[in-house]
Amino acid sequence: MSMPATADLYDTHGEKLRVAAPIFRDFGAIRSFAGAAATVKVFEDNSLVRAALETPGAGRVLVVDGGGSLRCALVGDKLALLGQQNSWAGIIVYGCIRDSVPISRIALGVKALATNPRKSVKKGEGEFDVTLRFAEVTIAPGDYVYADEDGVMIADHKLD
């Protein structure tokens, strides 16, 4: 998806946008992506992340609040590939990913705090479709996410 740079969007729309703290690193082959937010809140358990990515993405961005944990990964190459195959625009993880080299070749936007080779537990714990608060922003299901190399911004709706 071609979109204006986040800096240009900010210049045009200013305070209509919520700008996330600059804490995310780029990992996917797609560096510029946007879409309506689907949200998941988990802690060191990626079961709901997988469940979300198994559904049709329809160009949405899966926003994962992993509590900022650096102790295990919530997304690996298999889940990133699943996201690409199911037409998700991207995944933003407030936590870690793993398999960063294969993910760098998958045509999907992937942002996260860091990498960790340790896999998560799979107990099915967490919540879908909840309002998230991390990186100094609030993200509700259906908000519009804009992301590129300069950062992540959130709007209440898609901007013209």
Give each language-model segment a name.
Residues 140, 144-156:
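Mixed-charge, glycine-accented linear interaction segment located at domain edges/termini
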